[in-house]
């Protein structure tokens, strides 16, 4: 019996021993860091020997640098979007432009020469190479004009670029450790980190921190292996920020747009001005883009200018792209030659009529069509204006997701004033609503002030409104609740202040305060149609002027003369001196 028990015990013991060994092995595997290394060519997505990865501010870019004859070239779109948006590539005429505060710097494709205004300079090797879809620009040429630094590394080839400056958090490795693809000891190793090596901490975690090495490897490191954690100031001591100057007035701007549709209208300027108070800038709508070569239509009058000057009023001629629908503004602005012609035409008009300022009112611009070209147009025009003592103002819509390309901050570097077109919140073809509700205007102003200094902002205000006509799509349905405007055909007509008020009283309606819009509102029924109007009057105007005063803006602008009730000017002069 004992002989039978002994082998059984041995077998059980062996099973326990084997299970123990398996358990211990499993624990060892679980808690032993992997030594697997990540393929850095795969990590940086490098597929050919002439490519270099681009790491910008510790983020790996989808774009790649090209190594050509030992020189580093980067794609124009990468330069524009990630390094310096002031570079402009004219793909039509194969020229690279960069605009400083005082000069236009140009470089033709496949040339080593760049021109600063009219002075030629030799860069030493090809600056820009045209490609089928874009252009490749020498990185050292970009660096010459940009607040960036870069370093090159190999195995694999990569370029580490810094564009953001300021405070960063750094740490040192307390012992030899690793940067891994993800947080965890089983994640592949990106880099062996030596004791004392400095890293930038990008994100703090409980056990693992996201960090970047100086040679552009971004991964995760055990927080317990870091020491000497501190905040460091990152500076580029090799770059001096460019100084921009502006032609600004030592008084509040009170600008009135004066719509001129033919030359004979200019003779009415004395009567128009006599009905205003406090206006110190007239902006007549005299000029518009009239052909695809950059030519202008001209409705201006020297007598008009002389009269304004005799009254102590400046004249800022308005130049627009709206009147001639047959003109391809995109073509004009995307070709450097025709864009230059347009600028020269504007300056010629300014000289001929002794204009004090130029007001640019280009609208319906999309980024895809010519957004970047429009900003380049403003830069180049600003240099010409400033060289001749002429003020430049630019009319812009309120900031929105679809017009971020306007780059208002850079626009403000070059233009003297940015005029917010604080109207057309609702427009012909939209749902019924206010032309410029107070919350909408306030938001638009606040968003603009995030990019443009207050002393360069002029708030544009409407002197008109829209009366909305809502007709049921089903003629058998009575006008009831209009919350669902999809049930109605909606049209609108523009009315000046007095004409809109007359419509309200003429239809036996009563206007009452609408707290949501900050305006007086009226509605009435007629012939199974509902009419709505958010009035522009002294109430709405004063609330916007209060915004000008509160935010210490450069002034206000009004569209357009002839739409106003004469009583508004007493309110205007309370706020604009």
Regions found by a protein language model. Give the residues of each.
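Short, acidic/polar
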Residues: 260-276, 336-351, 400-408, 536-549
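Substrate-binding surface in catalytic domains of secreted glycosidases
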Residues: 292-299, 344, 367, 372-500
């Amino acid at each position: 019996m004992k002989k039978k028990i002994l082998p059984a015990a041995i077998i059980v013991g062996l099973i326990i021993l084997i299970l123990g060994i398996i358990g211990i092995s499993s624990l060892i595997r679980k808690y032993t860091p992997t030594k697997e290394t990540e393929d850095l060519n795969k990590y940086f997505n490098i597929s050919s020997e002439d490519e270099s990865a681009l790491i910008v501010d510790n983020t790996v870019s989808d774009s790649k640098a090209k190594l050509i004859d030992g020189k580093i070239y980067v794609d124009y779109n990468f330069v524009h979007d990630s390094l310096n948006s002031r570079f402009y590539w004219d793909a039509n005429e194969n020229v690279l432009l960069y605009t400083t505060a005082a000069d236009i710097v140009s470089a033709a494709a496949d040339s080593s020469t760049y021109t600063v205004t009219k002075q030629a300079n030799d860069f030493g090797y090809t600056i820009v190479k045209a490609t089928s879809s874009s252009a490749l620009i020498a990185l050292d040429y970009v660096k010459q004009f940009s607040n960036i630094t870069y370093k090159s590394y190999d195995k694999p080839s990569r370029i580490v670029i810094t564009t953001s400056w300021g405070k960063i958090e750094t740490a040192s490795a307390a012992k030899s450790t690793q940067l891994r693809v993800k947080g965890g000891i089983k994640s592949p190793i990106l880099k062996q980190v030596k004791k004392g090596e400095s890293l930038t901490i990008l994100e703090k975690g409980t056990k693992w921190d996201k960090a970047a090495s100086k040679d552009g490897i971004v991964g995760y490191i055990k927080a317990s292996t870091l020491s000497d954690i501190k905040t460091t100031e990152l500076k580029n001591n090799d770059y001096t920020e460019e100084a921009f100057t502006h032609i600004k007035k030592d008084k509040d701007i009170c600008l009135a747009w004066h719509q001129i549709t033919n030359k004979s209208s200019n003779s009415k300027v004395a009567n128009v001005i006599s009905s205003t108070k406090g206006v110190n800038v007239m902006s007549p709508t005299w000029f518009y883009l009239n052909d695809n070569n950059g030519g202008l239509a001209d409705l201006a009058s020297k007598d008009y200018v002389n009269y304004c000057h005799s009254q102590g009023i400046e004249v800022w001629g308005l130049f627009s792209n709206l009147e001639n629908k047959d003109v391809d503004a995109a073509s004009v602005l995307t070709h450097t030659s025709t864009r230059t012609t347009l600028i020269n035409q504007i300056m010629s008009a300014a000289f001929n009529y002794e204009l004090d300022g130029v007001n640019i009112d280009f609208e319906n611009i999309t980024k895809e069509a010519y957004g970047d070209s429009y900003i380049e147009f403003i830069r180049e025009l600003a240099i010409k204006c400033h060289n001749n003592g002429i003020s430049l103002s630019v009319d812009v819509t309120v900031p929105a997701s679809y017009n971020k390309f306007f780059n208002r901050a850079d626009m403000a570097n070059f233009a003297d004033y940015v005029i917010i077109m604080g109207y057309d919140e609702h427009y012909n073809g939209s749902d019924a609503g206010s032309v410029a509700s107070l919350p909408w205007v306030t938001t638009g102003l606040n968003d603009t002030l995030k990019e443009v200094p207050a002393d360069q902002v002029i708030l544009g205000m409407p002197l008109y409104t829209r009366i909305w006509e809502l007709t049921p799509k089903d003629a058998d349905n009575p006008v009831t609740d209009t919350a669902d405007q999809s049930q109605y055909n909606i049209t609108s007509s523009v009315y000046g202040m007095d004409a809109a008020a007359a419509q309200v009283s003429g239809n036996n309606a009563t206007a009452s305060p609408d707290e949501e819009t900050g305006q007086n509102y009226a509605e009435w029924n007629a012939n199974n149609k509902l009419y709505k109007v958010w009035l522009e009057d002294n109430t709405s105007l004063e609330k916007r002027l209060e915004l000008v005063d509160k935010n210490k803006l450069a002034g206000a602008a009004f569209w357009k003369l002839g739409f106003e009730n004469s009583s508004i000017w007493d309110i205007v002069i309370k706020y604009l001196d």
